Amino acid sequence: MMFRVTSVGCLLLVIVFLNLVVPTSACRAEGTYCENDSQCCLNECCWGGCGHPCRHPGKRSKLQEFFRQR
């Protein structure tokens, strides 16, 4: 009887431990706020948001932004 109680206790401890580990290692999905690459699931933090691939503005988008400001 003592062996069965110990096994159940160990099983419950393992379940509790797994529930504690999962939330601490969760990564952030694409489009959510981030501060560095390690926070994102795709390891790409671009200008405060998780994204893949990291999109850099080209000449066309810079030109459109220039005309929007005028």
Swiss-Prot record:
Residues 1-26 form the signal peptide. The modification 4-carboxyglutamate is found at E30, E35, E44. The modification Proline amide is found at P57. It is found in: Secreted. Contains 4 disulfide bonds. GO terms for molecular function: potassium channel regulator activity; toxin activity. Transmembrane segments: none annotated. Keywords: Amidation, Cleavage on pair of basic residues, Disulfide bond, Gamma-carboxyglutamic acid, Hydroxylation, Ion channel impairing toxin, Neurotoxin, Potassium channel impairing toxin, Secreted, Signal, Toxin. The modification 4-hydroxyproline is found at P53. Residues 61-70 form a propeptide. Expressed by the venom duct. InterPro entries: Conotoxin-I_CS (IPR013141), Conotoxin_I2 (IPR020242). The cysteine framework is XI (C-C-CC-CC-C-C). Belongs to the conotoxin I2 superfamily. Modulator of potassium channels, specifically up-modulates the calcium and voltage-gated BK channels, has no effect on single channel conductance, but increases the open probability of BK channels. This is Kappa-conotoxin BtX.
